[in-house]
């Protein structure tokens, strides 16, 4: 199953000229719920004599801080990733297979923690070393390096597009320990929408193969 990551737009006055780390701090403090569309491009390292393999997928994303989020991959294959606050559910529609993992054991040093799970910057700093990164492609970037060396995540960069009245979370770049790079781009973001109470509930479909880890 594909790994994931996260997004959103934070409307906030006075962020023009601020660094990416400041934009990340404001976003975590002020955006408690969010909803958006996303496109994800995953590039695997090139093998000898071959071009890098590129896969593109798209779908929707919702979150409610802290610790609840949902990715719904719609193209090219249907997959759902749902964190309900206790359990992280991964559902592959084509395989009719569900994987359930204890959320507290898997989310600390992940892209999801950066955007959707952590309640504040201090919580992020417990698991990541955070810093401003150089501007690139017209965006301001915050860099996050996991403090734990046990996981597969090597680094994350969060890109913000800043203006006079708003800072928009525009991109998320993820590099894993195998050299695979994932870039998520976000659109149609809604800031602090009122999400239905059952948005993050998940019940394995009848007949699905359920694997608990």
UniProtKB/Swiss-Prot annotation:
Protein name: Outer-membrane lipoprotein carrier protein
Pfam families linked: LolA
This protein's record includes keyword Chaperone: yes
Keywords attached to this entry: Chaperone, Periplasm, Protein transport, Signal, Transport
Principal location: periplasm
CDD domains: LolA (cd16325)
InterPro entries: LolA/LolB/LppX, OM_lipoprot_carrier_LolA-like, OM_lipoprot_carrier_LolA_Pbac
Organism: Albidiferax ferrireducens (strain ATCC BAA-621 / DSM 15236 / T118)
Keyword check for Signal: yes
Function noted in UniProt: Participates in the translocation of lipoproteins from the inner membrane to the outer membrane. Only forms a complex with a lipoprotein if the residue after the N-terminal Cys is not an aspartate (The Asp acts as a targeting signal to indicate that the lipoprotein should stay in the inner membrane).
HAMAP family with a match to the protein in the record: LolA (MF_00240)
Gene Ontology cellular component annotations, sorted alphabetically: periplasmic space
Similarity comment: family membership: Belongs to the LolA family.
Gene: lolA
């Amino acid at each position: 199953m594909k790994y994931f990551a996260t997004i959103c737009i934070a409307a906030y006055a006075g962020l023009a000229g601020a660094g990416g780390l400041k934009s990340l701090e404001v976003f975590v403090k002020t955006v408690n719920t969010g909803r958006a569309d996303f496109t994800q491009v995953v590039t695997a390292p090139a093998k000898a004599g071959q071009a890098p393999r590129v896969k593109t997928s798209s779908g929707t994303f919702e979150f409610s801080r802290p610790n609840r989020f949902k990715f719904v991959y719609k193209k090219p294959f249907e997959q759902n990733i749902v964190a309900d606050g206790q359990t992280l559910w991964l559902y592959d529609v084509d395989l009719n297979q569900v994987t359930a993992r204890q959320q507290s054991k898997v989310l600390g040093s992940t892209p999801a923690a950066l955007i959707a799970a952590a309640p504040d910057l201090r919580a992020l700093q417990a698991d990541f070393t955070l810093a401003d990164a150089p501007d690139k492609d017209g965006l301001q970037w915050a860099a996050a390096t996991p403090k734990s060396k046990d996981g597969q995540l090597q680094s994350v960069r969060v890109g913000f597009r800043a203006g006079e009245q708003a800072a928009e979370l525009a991109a998320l770049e993820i590099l894993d320990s195998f050299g695979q790079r994932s870039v998520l781009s976000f659109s149609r973001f809604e800031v602090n929408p009122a999400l239905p109470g059952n948005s993050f509930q998940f019940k394995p479909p009848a007949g699905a193969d359920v694997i608990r880890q």
